[in-house]
């Protein structure tokens, strides 16, 4: 993530650019870079309040707000894994690929159309249980402390 690019993308007021900026924050595994965006949060929130970022199954504005929470948490020294229980869009497989967590085990429950995971945060070592629910068009994830 390039903080200067993120600032430009939010300031563009283009919904797609703003969505890309939010996700570059959410996918960044460098807390020091994420922290540098803290002074821009009031401006970003004002822009997002005025722009409908769209979204098919959920508002992309919610993703932007989640990215702002990541920035605030990084600034306060709070581990990124603390956002998991506040959302239902982050896939544990992708979080593993990006280096945030390790999947300790997973189990597919075909009769429930669910996959269950136990994961460990790579930063603070907290253990979390994740339930993927795939009964609709888009899977969603329920994250809980183990």
Model-derived regions, located:
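Amphipathic alpha-helical scaffolding segments comprising HEAT/armadillo-like alpha-solenoid repeats
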Residues: 1-9, 30-49, 75
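Alpha-helix N-cap/helix-start positions at coil->helix boundaries
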Residues: 15-16
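Structural detector for internal amphipathic alpha-helices that build alpha-solenoid repeat scaffolds
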Residues: 19-30, 54-71
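A short, structured loop/turn motif at beta-sheet edges
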Residues: 29-32, 123-125
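Alpha-helical linker/edge segments of TPR/alpha-solenoid repeat scaffolds
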Residues: 49-51, 71-82
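Short recognition patches in nucleic-acid-associated and regulatory proteins
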Residues: 76-114, 130-133, 140
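Short, compact, well-ordered microdomains
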Residues: 115-146
């Amino acid at each position: 993530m390039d903080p200067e690019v993120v600032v430009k993308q939010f300031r563009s007021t283009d919904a797609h650019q703003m969505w890309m900026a939010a996700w570059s924050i959410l996918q960044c595994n460098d807390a020091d870079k994420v922290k540098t965006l803290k002074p821009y949060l009031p401006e970003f929130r004002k822009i997002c309040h005025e722009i409908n970022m769209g979204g098919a199954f959920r508002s992309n504005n919610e993703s932007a707000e989640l990215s702002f929470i990541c920035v605030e948490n990084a600034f306060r020294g709070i581990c990124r894994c603390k956002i998991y229980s506040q959302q239902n869009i982050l896939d544990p497989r992708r979080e593993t690929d990006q280096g945030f967590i390790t999947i300790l085990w997973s189990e597919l429950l075909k009769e429930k159309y669910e996959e269950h995971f136990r994961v460990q945060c790579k930063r603070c070592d907290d253990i979390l249980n994740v339930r993927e629910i795939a009964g609709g068009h888009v899977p969603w994830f329920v994250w809980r402390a183990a």
